[in-house]
Amino acid sequence: MFNNHLHLTPFIHIDDFQQIRINGPFELTVLSPHSCQLSGNGYILIIESENTLISSMNVEEVIINVQELKRLELRKMEIV
């Protein structure tokens, strides 16, 4: 039997370090006008720049525009 449900593969696409596109299940937290954090699938992505702007967001994807990227960190969540 063929199952035609769409299963999105999480990915991070970085375009010239000015636009970051993230796909997959995640939770977005805006920490300040300069930084945001995405968490999901056991990982945390931290983005810091001079200006961090959420330009587009829907259930499956977020597009973040940054100016003068200062920090882009992907780390595994600590499971306690």
Features from the language model and the residues they span:
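N-terminal intrinsically disordered, cationic/polar leader segments
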Residues: 2-80
